[in-house]
Amino acid sequence: MVKLNENTAYKRGQELLDAGQYEEAIQKFSDVIAENPRAWKAMNSQGFAYQKMSKYTDAVECFDRALAINPKSVEVLNNKGVTLSMRGLYKEAIACFDEAFANDRTSLEALNGKAIALQHMFSYKEALDVLEEAMKIDSKHPQTLLSIAVTLQKLKQYDRSISFFKKVLSGDKYNTKAWNGIGVTYQLMGDNESALKCFTKILNINSQELQAWISIGYVYQKMFKFKDALKCYKKAQAIVGGRYTHKLYDGLASCLTKLSEFDQAIEVYKLIYQSEEGKRKWDAQRSIKFVNKLKRKQAVGQLPDIIPKTDAEDTDASVAE
């Protein structure tokens, strides 16, 4: 039997992970773990790949296996915290971030992760308190500035929010998250034209930037330009090669609903239901029921002129995650 070169296999797994080939990466990390059952770094990377596929339960299992071997790993604790937060288990996520920060009092990832979880719990003041602590460690850290900007955005302090996004741009004028954040803020202020200019700026930086196409599609929906929005979502699909991404498919399903393409919308919501766990899964289930109801109304000529927003339509345009 040929002995596997663990380092080479792990490196190849990381390359596959970076390329978005998550299933192939998971298999490569499995090969590493089969050769060395204590390869906790491979378990961590495997968990990250599962997270990217929205398989949060599998991801947490991988992180727990890694932590059983290396319980002090700040990286694994932070990854587990992010995954739990994505799963909607915010208190459990905060516990992971607190443990990570206790192990490393300079972990900005832990503080930002905790702040984002608090945002989702609508605890914005507490989130700002955590981010203030992060600023004491590094006042120019881009992710911290983005997190503060998003928190202020949630508090409807739009001018202050934009000022923090601009602080990020002062250090990196090509930061697409900051441009997206400013665009989202303008959209929340009702200035769709300024929002579109920001998102177009992103495409001038990188025409393949997925979030920009999704954001433009979202604004077009707000402007009732549903056919233009659909073109944006189709472009985004082409960029990812049809690979599932929640924000993309949620926006696509919403747009198809507004265009009265109910059968297509239902199929997309079914894909979301099959791909997700937790709140997103049940939101998709409610949306399927909602669109079926609209379909029945259409059949008897009782469909409203303007389709109302579906239960699961994602209005959270956060850029800090």
Predicted regions and their residues:
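Helix-start (N-cap) detector for alpha-helical repeat units in TPR-like alpha-solenoids
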Residues: 6, 40-41, 74-75, 108-109, ...
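Register position in tetratricopeptide repeats
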Residues: 18-19, 52, 86, 120-121, ...
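Canonical positions in the second alpha-helix
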Residues: 32, 65-66, 99-100, 133-134, ...
